[in-house]
Amino acid sequence: MFTLKKSLLLIFFLGTISLSLCEKERDADDDEVEVIKQEEKRGFLNTAMNTVTNLAGTLMDKAKCKIRGC
């Protein structure tokens, strides 16, 4: 009876450890997904901001050219 309890306790302990490791990996994967989404947002905002900046610069150059008579 003692060996049965001992082996059941060992199985329970190993199962608990493996479950906790799986949860940690799952949490780590969720964090990676959030980081990727933030990078995508940042990439989109940077692209949009660069486009607006370039467009504004081009419009300013054209306005200066019209004023000066290029």
Curated annotation (Swiss-Prot):
Family per similarity comment: Belongs to the frog skin active peptide (FSAP) family. Ranatuerin subfamily.
Q: Which InterPro entries did the record assign?
A: Antimicrobial_frog_2, Frog_antimicrobial_propeptide
The UniProt entry's GO biological process terms, in alphabetical order, are: defense response to Gram-negative bacterium; hemolysis in another organism
Q: Identify the stretch annotated as signal peptide in this record.
A: 1-22
Per UniProt, which keywords does this protein have?
Answer: Amphibian defense peptide, Antibiotic, Antimicrobial, Cleavage on pair of basic residues, Cytolysis, Disulfide bond, Hemolysis, Secreted, Signal
The record lists its disulfide bonds as: C65-C70
Highest taxon of the source?
Eukaryota
Q: Which GO terms describe its cellular component?
A: extracellular region
Q: Which Pfam families match?
A: Antimicrobial_2 (PF08023), FSAP_sig_propep (PF03032)
Q: Does the keyword Lyase apply?
A: no
Main location (coarse class): secreted
Any idea what this protein is called?
A: Ranatuerin-2SN1
Tell me which species this is from.
Sylvirana spinulosa (Fine-spined frog)
Provide the protein's localization. Answer: Secreted
